[in-house]
Structure formats: structure tokens, C-alpha cells
């Protein structure tokens, strides 16, 4: 697909109403340094320096859909415990409809704790219930599906075998999809795929497909036989088998097969990559793409996802930058964080001074340009952290941004003073600053040093903060107001 088609896809994605049904869980990350061996046992001692709580399982699917710009609702059952409260809190500010999330006081909310040192996962600790939800809460889920399914454009089933997706629930979801003409896209688990009969498309990996088909998949012929068995037996429209370094293989009910090669890249972490495939594939189908086109976009997104550490999302801007060919010089400046970190590290060894600034840069104007030109004078490389569309909406309101993240990134990348652009989905650029460790952090003159996010981080290793005065009277807010009131002057 060409750049304009991809950009159009993610513009349409903002109108998509997606329902995620499945197992919600919390992902806890304990980041630290492992420099000692315990005197109690031959194990590493990790000195924890940072802790993160993130949405996991079906929650990571939600995160991906929000990052893609969709309107999202969730249907699940969680515990009425502290982790359940943490999980609900993790949805804050995402604009997600949680009316279909039910709390069972007798149930344990799933939580997975990962301990990471030197960018390597050392151990994972699980706290969860794998029992099926009770009949009472199964009825609540079934009632929600019956009452609400018709208002969605696509239904995503995220099965982690934690008990929410009972046979009755799955039967109801697939039946609703067929009845209403809504794609039902399933990330399956387990060995019995009969429970997914009637879904639109399944996205197992090779090992899962081998287990479900009970057939060896060591050759292309074996892969095809297994896929044909699953397609026919489950009455699917299509089957997308992910094959790690070999890409993906799409098998369709009409007999067509499409093999999609992967893009060679360094793999940091496969955690959550399946959630990214599920999300991007579903958005593509909901927007009217045929299976092959949607799978190709999902394959690109998966390649980006595995280059990140931990459960993470992929933004439209990252996908467009990876696919696009229309403006190769500008494209080369737009990087994901992991790729940029490697570049920055190499440039620093050559003695280059890194300058970092960030912002929404919606409706780029002369004030922005002069600000960025001044920022560039403080060092040798200027990296601009760009708020994603989802981040801008949280910060500025539902009517912003006026220009999508992909276009904003390309406009910034076209400026000679900008060396690299990296899109981030958080409300602040703290994670970018911690990772890139710029020597100079630049913010606008309307800030005081104490209010600058990342000041303590930068100063901790000898860097500094610079405040740049904005051009008087030049702001996106002022421009929007002038347009609304018709007071634009030459």
C-alpha cells in the first residue's frame, strides 16, 4: 500500500468503534540493576530503580487500539481486589468505555510481574485465577453482548485462558458477528479451537496452529495442510499464522494464500506483539481492507512492536514511517525509540551533543520554526519528541489535533534544523529523556526550570535545561481562534 492509502486508513480509524472482549490483566515491570549474586542462593540480586504498572492481556489490545485512534469499549470480568482497582485506574484518560467490565468480589485480578535488568527479563511472577467466570457473571457478559454488539464495527477476542471467554461467551460473540456482519478477530489460545467456530479470522502463531490442528508444521506443505484443516473445520473466512522471523502466512476460505515476509530487525521483546497484530489487523478489516492488505499492515506493526521492550503500542506515525516511500529523506528522520536510542548512542561516542525538545506541534507556525532553530544551536543533533494523536487529545481536548501525527512528524522532519523525530504516546516525554539522555533539554520560555519534565534526569548526569522565548503572539491556539472568529489578517 502507498503512503496516502495508509494515512487514509488511520484517518478512517478514528471513526471505528471497536469492542475488545477477553482477559484483562495488569503487567507490572520492575526495572533495575543486577550486579550482585545473592549470598543465600546462586541467584542474581536486582536493585530496583523503577516500577511500572501497565495494562496487559486484553488491556494491551485496548492500548494498541487507542494508540491507533479508535473508539474502544471493553467487556471482561475482573476481581473486586486492589489489583482490580489498579487496573481500572490504568484506563484513566484513555477515553475507553468500561461499562462492560464487571467486578466479581470472589475473583482474583490477573497480574504478571516481570523483573528486568540490562534490558533482559530475569523472572516473571504470576498472580491469577484460571477458573472460568461464575454463571452469574457469564450471564452479565452474555447480556452485554446481546445488547451492545450492534454498535461496533469490529469485535476483537483476546483469549489468555483466564476464564472470561467461556464456550457460551465465544459462541455468542461469533454468532453476533455473523448476524450483524461485524468482523470477529480472534487471538486464540489453547488446543481446542472448536470454541472459536464461526469467527471471521484467527491469528495463531506457528506453534499454536500446530497444537490446534494436531499436525506437524515443519515444512510449507505441513503449514498448508494444517491451515486448510483449521479453515474448514472452524468455518473461518481466513486464518493468519504468524511465523516469527519467517513473517506471516494468510490462508483464505476461497483458496488464496499470501506469504508476507518479515522485515529484518533486532528483536528486543516479543511480549505483546500478538496484541499488536490483532489490533492493527482488526482496524484494517473494520476500515474495509481486504484480508491481504490488512495482514501486510499488521506485519509491519508487529515488526515495530518486537523492537520495543515490554508490552507496548505502535502508533500510526510509526507504521506510516516504516511503510512510506513518498518522501524518503524525511522518512529517514522519523524513528521509533529503540532505533533512535541506538543511533544516539553511536553519535555520542563520536562526540556529538544531543539536544532534545518536545511538543504537539499542531499547525506548525513561525513561532515553532524559530523555537526549533534556536534549540538546534545548543548542540549537534536535535531530536523532537512528538505527542501522538491520542496523547494530544488527552492534553488538548477531543477536537485536537487538527493534523494527524504522521503528517506532523513529516512536517517537522522536513525542517533542516530537526535531525530526528520520535512519536510518543505518554502525556510526558520522561521515558524518552531517560532513554536518550540528552545533554541539553529545551523548553519554551513560558516554563520555569522547576516545571520542566526531565530536568532532574538531565541534571543528574551533568546535562542542562535551556528555556527559549516564544515569538510573541504566535500560537496554535491563537491561530485556531482567529480562524473560528474570521479575524485572520495578512
UniProtKB/Swiss-Prot annotation:
Active site: 275
EC number: 2.7.1.167, 2.7.7.70
InterPro entries cross-referenced by the UniProt entry: Bifunc_HldE, Cyt_trans-like, PfkB_dom, RfaE_dom_I, RfaE_dom_II, Ribokinase-like, Rossmann-like_a/b/a_fold
Substrates-to-products reaction catalysed: D-glycero-beta-D-manno-heptose 7-phosphate + ATP = D-glycero-beta-D-manno-heptose 1,7-bisphosphate + ADP + H(+); D-glycero-beta-D-manno-heptose 1-phosphate + ATP + H(+) = ADP-D-glycero-beta-D-manno-heptose + diphosphate
Keyword ATP-binding: yes
Keywords, in A-Z order: ATP-binding, Carbohydrate metabolism, Kinase, Multifunctional enzyme, Nucleotide-binding, Nucleotidyltransferase, Transferase
Function: Catalyzes the ADP transfer from ATP to D-glycero-beta-D-manno-heptose 1-phosphate, yielding ADP-D-glycero-beta-D-manno-heptose.
Similarity remark: In the N-terminal section; belongs to the carbohydrate kinase PfkB family.
Protein name as catalogued: Bifunctional protein HldE
Species: Geotalea uraniireducens (strain Rf4)
